[in-house]
């Protein structure tokens, strides 16, 4: 069963904060495409993107979305970043692209959800709600009401990625929360997120109702607390491996820049959030930063490899 891993790279040049792709035949060993160069390069907004998400729509086409943000372009001469300014004076748009075949992409679009009080919109992710036949985009944001002090998870609904409902609060805690990942398995919704304090780490909650009460997973919290530098993991994404095991990827940034990227955890059964770290079972050509893994067909896998491998000197796309 092949997989596509959409992600960005942490570099000191803007070409890292663009859309990069990798593929895998087995879900464990990933190969970069396009010579490890971007497949899509932003030409609007902040001229870069982070927190890449991709979903296969009902019509079998694809939508990519990402945070409209280029950290490199906001660094000072010493490579320092003012995160308080970025979270209170950031972009109020997300970036969006469409694709029918994962090798050709529409031009970048900036999508606005209609709220001027947001200080930023980070880590957007698409979840298909089959009960309402809606695509839900949930994302992290700060708001003016508390002087942009606490991040929470908001959501908007769409059916066509052109028209969006007014964003509402989806999930919050006493401290800030961000980097939400939402998946439904066997009738249970699983929400992964990261807290900003007390404690600073990734969390997991479950619910039988998407907009109902969430049950905190203390076993998951205790395991996360046992990790080396637990506060240096973020950006959860999950997928089911061909053998039925559940893979959780967490983006680790508690090291030098060239070693930053996703580290894998496995549970023996999809929906059972008792994970253990298994770095030795996976291989990556470089550090993959905040992204998304989806299943693709054998034909799509071969087409991606053939297209990009046969494009000598292929430049990342700004538009078809």
Describe the predicted segments one by one.
Residues 1-320:
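Carbohydrate-active catalytic/glycan-binding domains of CAZyme proteins
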């Amino acid at each position: 069963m092949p997989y596509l891993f959409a992600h960005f790279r942490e570099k000191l040049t803007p070409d890292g904060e663009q859309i990069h792709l990798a593929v895998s035949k087995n879900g464990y060993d990933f190969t970069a495409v396009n010579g490890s160069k971007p497949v899509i390069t932003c030409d609007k907004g902040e001229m870069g993107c982070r927190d890449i998400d991709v979903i296969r729509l009902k019509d079998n086409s694809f939508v990519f979305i990402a945070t409209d943000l280029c950290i490199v372009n906001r660094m000072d001469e010493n490579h320092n970043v003012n995160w308080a300014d970025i979270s209170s004076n950031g972009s109020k748009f997300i970036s969006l692209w469409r694709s029918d075949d994962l090798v050709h992409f529409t031009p970048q679009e900036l999508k606005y959800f209609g709220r001027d009080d947001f200080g930023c919109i980070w880590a957007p992710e698409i979840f298909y709600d089959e009960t309402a036949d809606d695509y839900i985009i949930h994302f992290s944001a700060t708001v003016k009401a508390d002087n942009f002090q606490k991040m929470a998870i908001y959501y908007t609904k769409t059916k066509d990625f052109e028209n969006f409902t007014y964003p509402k609060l989806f999930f919050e805690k006493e401290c800030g929360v961000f980097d939400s990942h939402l998946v439904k398995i066997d009738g249970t919704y699983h929400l992964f997120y990261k807290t900003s304090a007390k404690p600073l780490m990734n969390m997991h909650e479950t619910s039988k109702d998407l907009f109902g009460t969430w049950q905190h997973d203390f076993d998951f919290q205790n395991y996360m607390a046992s990790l080396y530098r637990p506060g240096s993991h973020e950006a959860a994404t999950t997928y089911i491996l061909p053998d039925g095991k559940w893979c959780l990827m967490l983006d680790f940034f508690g090291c030098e820049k060239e070693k930053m990227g996703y580290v894998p955890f496995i549970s023996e059964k999809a929906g059972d959030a008792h994970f253990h770290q298994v770095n030795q079972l996976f291989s990556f050509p470089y550090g993959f930063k905040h992204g998304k893994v989806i299943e693709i067909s054998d034909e799509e896998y071969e087409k991606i490899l053939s297209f990009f491998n046969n494009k000598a000197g292929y430049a990342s796309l700004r538009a078809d």
